[in-house]
Amino acid sequence: MKQVVIHDPTLRDGQHAVHHRLGLTELRRYAEAADAARVPVVEVGHGNGLGASSLQVGLAAATDDAMLSTVREALRHSRLGTFMLPGWGTSDDLRRAISHGVDVFRVGVHATEASLAEHHLGFLRDAGAEAHCVLMMSHMASPGELAEQAARAVGYGAQAVGIMDSAGHFLPPDVTARIGAIVEAVGTVPVIFHGHNNLGMAVANSVAAAEAGARIIDGCARGFGAGAGNTQLEVLVPVLERSGFATGIDLYALLDAADLAERELMPAPPVPASMSIVSGLAGVFSGFKHRVVELAGAAGVDPREVFFELGRRQAIAGQEDLIVDVVAELSGRGPKTDAA
């Protein structure tokens, strides 16, 4: 059987679903359960990564230092991972994370902007740390563009590269084409896939990624994450095993960890609700959902139309101001712009 490495961002990406408010006890208990299941990598942090706790995107319940040290102490078999976005995280944040014993660093950038990771990947390379680079909102770039960006990231020092289906927009053939192109471009460098479940395709897309050559696959307990959630880890693992890929994970212990996560980490497991389906079809960042619904409701505009217009404009995270413009235009209170 071919080996795949499972990367579990339950304690980082899942934070988006609870406004980044997971406490240290919750982090420790899930980390211990994932470790008992022999999950290879357990990622922890604010949902937006190192240095991101703020009024702008949400204050975490604990500091980065406290989260990393708590989970580090809980892990005996699993490796400790963390995440950062250039613009939030800094070299100082990376340096402190190294001091806490982080084993795997992920640097996330927009699908066409690998150059933004150059400084941080170089810093981690020079520090002797394992650094990965993930290209987010990857449906907004062609297979060839993603392959080119991934190759650049490897040149900057990434020891694994891959894509995040941040909007949950892909179907399996989309994943096959993109992962295949990246694998061809980077050779023996491991390729990563991180799915979202807006269209209910996260597990199928992850299997397609593995079959196309991805060797690092992400999944969260109960799919814990914003909107429709991420790839459901305890479903992903046995499906991969049935598909001929070895994970090295203890299934019963993994199911126990998922049960614990449902009881202690989340108010309810995520599902592909109507707005999540629409945002996935439109190819729009799931984090826009609450703001779209709020502004559209106040203006008497159908939020589904707002999502599809944002998709036509290729809105990305950080462009929340576009929501205001689109709602105003659809309600007849604003002029049409050239971007429409």
Curated annotation (Swiss-Prot):
Keywords: Aromatic hydrocarbons catabolism, Lyase, Manganese, Metal-binding. GO terms for biological process: catabolic process; L-leucine biosynthetic process. InterPro entries: 2-IPM_HCS-like, 4OH_2_O-val_aldolase, Aldolase_TIM, DmpG_comm, DRE_TIM_HOA, PYR_CT. CDD domains: DRE_TIM_HOA (cd07943). The active site is at H16 (proton acceptor). It catalyses: (S)-4-hydroxy-2-oxopentanoate = acetaldehyde + pyruvate. Substrate binds at R12, D13, S166, H194. Mn(2+) binds at D13, H194, H196. The record marks R12 as: Transition state stabilizer. GO terms for molecular function: 2-isopropylmalate synthase activity; 4-hydroxy-2-oxovalerate aldolase activity; manganese ion binding. Residues 4-255 form the Pyruvate carboxyltransferase domain. Belongs to the 4-hydroxy-2-oxovalerate aldolase family. PANTHER family: 2-ISOPROPYLMALATE SYNTHASE 1, CHLOROPLASTIC-RELATED (PTHR10277:SF9), HOMOCITRATE SYNTHASE-RELATED (PTHR10277). This is 4-hydroxy-2-oxovalerate aldolase. It comes from Streptomyces griseus subsp. griseus (strain JCM 4626 / CBS 651.72 / NBRC 13350 / KCC S-0626 / ISP 5235). The lineage of its organism: Bacteria, Bacillati, Actinomycetota, Actinomycetes, Kitasatosporales.
